[in-house]
Amino acid sequence: MAPVKKSDKKATLDAAAWMFNVVTSVGIIIVNKALMATYGFSFATTLTGLHFATTTLMTLVLRCLGYIQPSHLPFTELLKFILFANFSIVGMNVSLMWNSVGFYQIAKLSMIPVSCLLEVVFDKIRYSRDTKLSIGLVLVGVGVCTVTDVSVNTKGFVAAFVAVWSTALQQYYVHYLQRKYSLSSFNLLGHTAPAQAATLLIVGPFLDYWLTDKRVDMYDYNSVSVMFITLSCTIAIGTNLSQFICIGRFTAVSFQVLGHMKTILVLVMGFFFFDRDGLNLHVILGMIIAVLGMIWYGNASSKPGGKEKKNYSLPTTRQQKLGATSDSDEHRDKA
């Protein structure tokens, strides 16, 4: 049997990681929608804290089993990541409350240009014309799907601005920390999940009370709602892990662009399970445009020059000196 090429193996693992993220992300959205819309559990920030608490338990079990090796992440780096991640969660919840759904969706779409800017500034990434156009096509398609009424106010704009930048920075930082400190997805989750769980479970109940005027401890817990909360927390383990795996294997921009496939799947699943009137002609048209954009992005970014780091060449005289030095060293070694 012919040996498997390294590139083929990587492509298979990339596809598996991506499918893992899509399945868990769409699954948790459907479960959370049922939990909040049907059973009235509207405490989104506290629920996210429970998600990270469950993820923390998973990392502790994996560490005991030897699947997570000891690793180091400086406290300052952890603190910056937690600030970005928690501002992202809180900012998104506040933005949804203060803005129209249309402006909220536009804010989410603007994460792609912001992520591109971060990669250009910090990683010196250069995008080809086709890659830029394909990203634009995805934005247009998802915009047609999701953006309806668009109204904005000052405090809503500030909340959306904070949410977009903190989310983009958090996703960029996942990729950055894994590269800089040679951390696996499990290692990074082992460092970040406990801190996020602790902070969100402290802040969450107060923030949710401010947003909804309801107390999480006064919620009418029953066997069905507790089952949905448990299911949501269980799926969240896969969602959190797969996000770190995908951003580590790809980049924040690719994660955002291909991530809009989840938006389309959520719309389709929502049509079948919740809102029968939600899927109309302009939504279907937007889906088609977005999918074409994603296919174009995949082809454009994988081509030579589609997305690459800028190479800063040394001056000619400097290169010549280095070449001469290496030649003399080679002759000396031979002698």
Swiss-Prot record:
Region forming the signal peptide: none
InterPro entries: Sugar_P_trans_dom, TPT_transporter
Pfam families with a match to the protein in the record: TPT
Membrane topology according to the record: Multi-pass membrane protein
Domain of life: Eukaryota
Localization in the cell: Golgi apparatus membrane
Region (Disordered): 303-335
Membrane-spanning intervals of the chain: 11-31, 41-61, 78-98, 102-122, 133-153, 157-177, 186-206, 227-247, 254-274, 278-298
GO-annotated cellular components: Golgi apparatus; Golgi membrane; plasma membrane
Positions with biased composition (Polar residues): 313-326
GO terms classed as biological process: D-glucose transmembrane transport
Molecular function terms from GO: antiporter activity; transmembrane transporter activity
Modified residues (Phosphoserine): S326, S328
UniProt keyword terms in alphabetical order: Antiport, Golgi apparatus, Membrane, Phosphoprotein, Sugar transport, Transmembrane, Transmembrane helix, Transport
Principal location: Golgi
Functional description taken from the UniProt entry: Nucleotide-sugar transporter that transports UDP-rhamnose or UDP-galactose and UMP in a strict counter-exchange mode.
Annotated family: Belongs to the TPT transporter family. TPT (TC 2.A.7.9) subfamily.
Protein name listed in UniProt: UDP-rhamnose/UDP-galactose transporter 5
Source organism: Arabidopsis thaliana (Mouse-ear cress)
